[in-house]
Amino acid sequence: MSMFCYQCQEASQGIGCTVRGVCGKTDDVANLQDLLIFTLKGISFLNLKARETGVNKEKTDRFLFEGLFSTITNVNFDRNFFINKIKEAVALREEIKEDLKKAGIEVDESCEAIHWVYDTDEDIEAIAAEVGVLSTKDEDIRSLRELITYGVKGMAAYAYHAYQLGYKDDNIFRFMEKALAKVLDDSLTADDYVALALEAGKYGVDTMALLDKANTSTYGHPEITKVNIGVRNNPGILISGHDLKDLEQLLEQTAGTGVDVYTHGEMLPAHYYPAFKKYPHFVGNYGNAWWQQDREFELFNGPILMTTNCLVPPKDSYKDRVYTTGVVGFEGVKYIPEGPDGKKDFSEIIEHAKRCKPPVEIERGEIIGGFAHNQVLELADKIVEAVKTGAIKRFFVMAGCDGRMKSRTYYTEFAKALPKDTVILTAGCAKYRYNKLNLGDINGIPRVLDAGQCNDSYSLAVIAMKLKEVFGLNDINKLPISYNIAWYEQKAVIVLLALLYLGVKNIHLGPTLPAFLSPNVTKVLVDKFGIGGITNVEDDMKMFMGE
């Protein structure tokens, strides 16, 4: 069996993975993910009609965003998960068709995504090998369809987290279905798909705003916080991913047990929320970005809870200490389900932790963060004054993702080389390339302002829009802000589309441009939006500083 996947930045040779994913997923899992997405497109086509007649069901919304989320890079590697999810998808699809039939609505059965069937698991795998990315023959149409699909995957991840906290917006689900249905439509042109990609950006903004509201309404607005990066002499649980509700439940259930809780990777910004500061056993952050987890999980000694991406296929030496939940999966790893009441029982992982040694100290000290939009706007007068007096000459948005590629040391060197009168605005795990450097401050304003997780790129957009208003500008691109963004997976795609929708131009993406962008589509993005790549620190610095 072979595969073709080019959805992440590490696509093999900058083209695509064809034998095994650089991420570690096998060819059969890659193909099953393709078939799940294909079937979700069919469900979306049908559910749009169901919405029009009022026979749609909320369970379809949840199935859609959970299914999409499970196919994001480094979320789920489990073949059986995808076999079962595809079977559930087909059953749901047929249920929607039956509901439409009862409502007197005819369904166009010519679309294969709506009518394919199976008898055995072997049938599923055979069909999976035929419906992947390369089934769209036109390179440019394929490129745009995948750009939109990956953007919708990112949107689904953010919608999932908002939903977990009780926040949803039917307009977002309607758009996700519309977009997925349209990528099946062979009558659409490249121009149609460019317009749809920008519309995805609009709903990307809406979804990030919804998640921001969900997080801040539930846990308070992030505030300036110093986070411990050392350890204590108690057994611990390391929680990674992005799911704040999982963290909340874990903290509640570990209270008084003698087990400490540490964050890892993208869970670091949880420390910035006021609601989590009441837990004395919420110790700090352990380690760095996701791709270093093989070494860091080994040294942590205690169990690890993966709530979302990014999971790296675990080594045998610590695999028995890895637990997954939500849509995360890996064969042979323990899974903690959600109960009928929406709650999770973490007693097994807590008891496991009690039997483990305390974590090995790998660093010590503190890092500072919590500069989401509400906190930064409280400092607005100070920041505006620093800009007006020339103390701050330029802001650099360096949000995004980190990854394994050695060339990503560029971002560390770039941060070091920035003039002392510049400030970095960041969100996402890209921060780990420079958030432990001693870059100082400007009139008490740290030179690295960390807004939070990748979805908190929304905060950076809010900050930019507010600065535009304060300075009386009619164009966001007239602000002294440059965009040098590191990307890795599909949530970064929806952040990019959101920025393009907001009118931001001259965004530079690295360490490489997406493999899924064809030369012609890349040219459109360059000509229309000024999208660019990166070269080397010295030349890029001159370009950004206008030298």
Swiss-Prot record:
GO terms for biological process: response to hydrogen peroxide. Binds 1 [4Fe-4S] cluster. It is an enzyme of class 1 (oxidoreductase). The gene is hcp. Keywords: 4Fe-4S, Cytoplasm, Iron, Iron-sulfur, Metal-binding, Oxidoreductase. Gene3D superfamilies: 1.20.1270.20, 3.40.50.2030. The modification Cysteine persulfide is found at residue 401. It is found in: Cytoplasm. It catalyses: A + NH4(+) + H2O = hydroxylamine + AH2 + H(+). Its EC number is 1.7.99.1. [4Fe-4S] cluster binds at residues 5, 8, 17, 23. Signal peptide: none annotated. Its cofactor is [4Fe-4S] cluster; hybrid [4Fe-2O-2S] cluster. This is Hydroxylamine reductase. Belongs to the HCP family. Its main location: cytoplasm. One of its GO terms (cellular component) is cytoplasm.
